[in-house]
């Protein structure tokens, strides 16, 4: 039940999937559950490149959303009606994204989608304490507004003239640090080896002239 994390160039993601025994696939059909601000913005950004369906349980709100999203099919449902979901052929979905404000419903619907064989399931939760649990039950990705907000604050208060970027990953209790090294950087004042790094630090990648070395 181990979870492995890889730092790779985006062009090599397919190779990692194959190495881990997971075949890559192209996303075409996407279903978003939740017509809140995040769901609407996401649908608006995806609808021109993908076949997008958006579920909103409030019929009046669904009608308003439908008027604004020309290339998104807006449906009225809470995401837990099995008969309705089967009528929408959910087993053919490439990606399901649960974005309601109710994290219990998000988790339940995500488990249901996994049961029906949806290739990629993404769930939004409010409490970061659920991160590890949700990942363990088979959800492919977990997002949280709280974590996103924390990351943005970290980037601001711990930045050094845009030379250092910090991001936090609460589900594994680590922080990633991206450092831009220039000719005046203190990091170049002495020769460093990977073996010189403290045991708590792992060097993931070095990028030079737009290439990973």
Predicted regions and their residues:
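Cytosolic regulatory regions of ion transport systems
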Residues: 1-213
């Amino acid at each position: 039940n181990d979870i492995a994390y890889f730092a790779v160039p985006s062009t090599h993601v397919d190779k990692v999937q194959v190495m881990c025994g997971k075949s890559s696939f192209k996303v075409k059909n996407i279903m978003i559950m939740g017509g809140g601000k995040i769901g609407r913005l996401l649908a608006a950004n995806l609808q021109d490149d993908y076949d997008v369906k958006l579920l909103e349980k409030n019929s009046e709100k669904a009608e308003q959303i439908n008027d604004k999203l020309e290339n998104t099919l807006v449906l009225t449902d809470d995401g837990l009606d099995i008969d309705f979901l089967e009528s929408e052929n959910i087993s053919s979905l490439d990606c399901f994204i649960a974005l309601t404000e109710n994290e219990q419903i998000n988790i339940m619907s995500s488990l249901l989608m996994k049961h029906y064989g949806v290739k990629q399931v993404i769930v939004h939760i409010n409490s970061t304490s659920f991160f590890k649990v949700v990942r363990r039950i088979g959800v492919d990705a977990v997002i949280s507004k709280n974590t996103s907000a924390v990351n943005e604050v970290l980037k601001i208060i711990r930045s050094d003239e845009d030379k250092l970027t910090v991001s936090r990953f609460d589900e594994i209790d680590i922080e990633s640090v991206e450092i831009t090294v220039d000719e005046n950087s203190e990091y170049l004042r002495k020769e460093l080896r990977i073996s010189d790094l403290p045991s708590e630090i792992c060097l993931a990648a070095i990028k030079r002239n737009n290439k990973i070395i």
